[in-house]
Amino acid sequence: ESGQKEVFIDLEEEIIYEQYLETHLGDILANQSSSEDQKAEIFSKVSTNVVKDSFETSLGLGTMDYDTLRRTQSLVKNALIFIAETHSLKALSKMIGHDYKTYEHATKVLWFTVAFLRKNPDILEQIEPTYLTFDETQKKELLKQCGVGAILHDIGKAFVSQDILNKNGPLTTIEWEMIKRHPLNGLAMLLDSECPVFVKKAVLHHHEDFNGSGYPMGLDGQNIHILARVLRIVDVFDAMTSRRPYKEAMSPTMVAQIMIGIPPEKIKNE
């Protein structure tokens, strides 16, 4: 109301403010008096902080602890409600094309994965075929766990230095080998967690290609978990639509056209 667009707060107050946003995220996203753009910005901020904390905590402990996993699950639960609204997705889509950073990338992979699976319920049902029935309650729980897998898919990069992840130029052979280990590191961090087996498989397999040319195991075809194949597509889409130090972002339409033209033996037809 005063017309002031910026205020400065000290670090301690900022931490308290961020904790408040995370604790009350569900109420904030349901608040009808806030614009969708404002809510999308808050959701993005909270999710980025949760992912960042997940990386740092897991790196320190060498595993995903109970409290960190619970924070991630709570975030995804709120995300499912928010992303269900078309106007919310439109607000979130305005962030496509921003810089590619590991924490922000994890958040966008969550958005895209949830949207993709909602539009393709037949694929969602294949992710955990052990369900004897597939009612709405199970569907919501399965979608939540898929969201957890999506937001944690790169958790193994916690072991890779930011200098390598953000390097402006080609990687050395040693640096590339370190990058290629992140799915294995991710599995190791989640191995003793309560995450379902299919989430752990998705984290391990998300850089495998349908023709066996991916990493870290060189799996092919149906040996790659179907959620990992979804994450592979979403991962590539976000990377290509994001700005990098060495390239500008491509438009979503252009990327979709390119991906449709990718040989089917590379990513199949999902």
Report residues per predicted region:
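Short, internal active-site loops enriched in acidic
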Residues: D99, H206-F210
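Acidic/His-rich, divalent-metal-binding segments that scaffold phosphate/diphosphate chemistry
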Residues: S34-K180, L187-E194
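Divalent-cation-assisted or electrostatically stabilized phosphate/pyrophosphate-binding catalytic cores
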Residues: N166-M189, F210-E270
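Acidic/histidine metal-binding catalytic segments
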Residues: D122-V148, L190-H206, I224-I233, E248-M254, ...
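Terminal helices and disordered tails flanking the catalytic cores of nucleotide-processing hydrolases
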Residues: E1-T63, R70-Q73, F82, T86, ...
